[in-house]
Amino acid sequence: MVRINRALQLSAVCLLVGCSTATRQGSQPFSFRALDLRQQDPKGAPAWELKSPEARYDIQRKLAQALRPRGTVFRRGEPSILIAAERGTVIGDGQAIQLEGTVRITLLGEEPVEITGDTARWLPRQELMVIDQRPVALDRRSRISAETAQYFIKRDLVELRGAPVLEHWQDGRSKAGNAKTPAPLPLKVKAQWVDWKPERGDLTAPAVVRGEQFEQSKPAPAKDEKPAPSLVLTAQGLRGNLRQGYVDLVAPVQVRRADGKGWLDAKQTRWAINDQLLSSDQPFTGQFNALKAKGDRFTVDLEKSDVKVSRGCELEQPGERLTAMRCLWNWPSGRFEATDQVVLKRETYKQVTRAKRLEGKIGDDGTAVFSSPGERVNSRFTLPPKGQGGGGKKRAPAPIAF
């Protein structure tokens, strides 16, 4: 049997005894200097409390209207959750508490978690909070917004429903960077629904998810026009841990440039939210304009728009094929770099070029042209027999085109 401090009701009785006017007008709400409502657990330890510097109590309706209410939920006798709002309505002796106006629910700990909303219903006996207007849950570096949220306190579970959006919280990002070339905005991943355990950090969204990234430097769209994303990501779900700063995207995973100039098809891919990186240590395929690519491992830097293949890089376009241990290319500029055991093969004259490093760039026709500035290369050709391939003028050697 729980114990409830009846300070609210006792204060109402004292006020009635001390004021004859109040007795004649019992239907009118009464003003109190303060509200102090407390509940204990079966062992006598504090379970929760609600305080307010000013409240009005309606005896007949058993309602208390409080200004600037402040609540605390205890665990093992110690404060665990803090609750704050601009206004509150207490029903009975605390069966339900309606909170309104910038509601903040703070989970205490080494890395506090905050859940905010415009309104919330606190049901202490069910250990449940329902945030049904613009709920937002955020920790130090990540943020989830949705249409509705239910926080089951004892189960350490927040159910976010109504197209929840997971993103890197920009206010927590490092301010370092080049102001002349602003980085793209953080990737936002929209799910059908999300379950999150804020204390442990576990997060799951088992249905299809879609991520979008927008270029910060693009001009603002017209008033009725929605901005177009520069990068689109899809996966069959996600699972991860926000306290550890990662989410695993469930295969198959697709990353697409909105301009149609590049794509990646991958298996399970990890999204390091805090570092804004996508990575996978499983084989993938892709294409960049006319250039096909595949490799055994990749990383996408979402801030720099760089794609890095750190093992088993292969690039191919009609008549040419390049292999290397590592490759790096930048999507917006179309610049490439291949390093470590680079081998470029061309069908023309069966040319084979070996180098430690080759650079390249996507041309206007969508093909890549590579060069080796300041690097030594070794090329081998197989020339056709004399009399084949034309005669007469001596042709200049062809550039290393890829």
Give, region by region, the residue ranges found by the protein language model.
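Mature-chain termini and adjacent capping regions
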Residues: 1-402
